[in-house]
């Protein structure tokens, strides 16, 4: 490992890291279960999506190793893998999350995380995975770029809003750090997401400078910049990003050969296949949807079937399902923001209402193809979306 980051540190640091922090990897543990507690570990691995099947090294396109962000003493490791990676899992990739204990974050976290990421790269290669993709958000995106800068054998990198502020929350982003990596990094292909209005990084516009650098290099790259319709520091981890660019990213990674220039996304006229992959239960699960409209109160019968929409950056999906008790109404509700399920609902005044476990309220109205209103538990805000009709195919 001869990257510039690794050359700046004495080898003794690596030895200390091994002694101080327990290591759990695919080579010595089969426990990759989701929502683990860190215990006394600094690093541990989890599957990205425990409700989806693992492909394994023999059948998978490859493995995606995800690094999450950093936020002081907050439990950043609790953040789920982004929806766009769920789409990749559906399309033949195994997604693994490399998690870090927030209580052990130090000024040396970057170095240790890059080292551990590269160790996992070697482990998954030895396990037989044909391709290795590194991915990350914010600090995790920075780790991703430093890792591929330190090891030129990585097949692809996905960096979402990469960077870290100097001196913690009070500091500013130094964009030149990422730009220098872009000038020299050697990787099979690179996907870079730089959303508009990134408040965490001082609203700096980085897309034009990144394009100027990458366009001069012999490198296949996908750049989603400030002109893309994606906004906010976490824009790349939203349902909106998965909906608009997930299929494009999957194609970018799957193509056997790519020209050494910017990859252009072709927007699809039918977003439903992506919504279906993101939010419908696995095919083995019975949806048990209401198929006879007379099973619903007359005023809401137009709402029969699957419907979906966008609440700001979150994709939501709803459908009436068969209730075990006659006269009862139940709704399937799923979103890219929170885990979903099937919940009791009521009809009043020609609308359907449902209370989610977090006490927020969903209201469905049979206007046109349907409208959905989400209301906060304390009534402080609400969001509306016009619904579209989905399909079971």
Predicted feature locations:
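Conserved alpha/beta-hydrolase
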Residues: 88-104
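The feature captures the conserved acid-bearing segment of alpha/beta-hydrolase catalytic domains
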Residues: 162-224
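N-terminal cap/lid segment of alpha/beta-hydrolase-fold proteins
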Residues: 28-58
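C-terminal catalytic histidine-bearing segment of alpha/beta-hydrolase fold enzymes
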Residues: 217-282
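Gly/Ala-rich beta-loop-alpha elbow adjacent to hydrolase catalytic centers
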Residues: 136-140, 144
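Short, surface-exposed "cap/lid" segments of acyl-processing enzymes
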Residues: 57-88
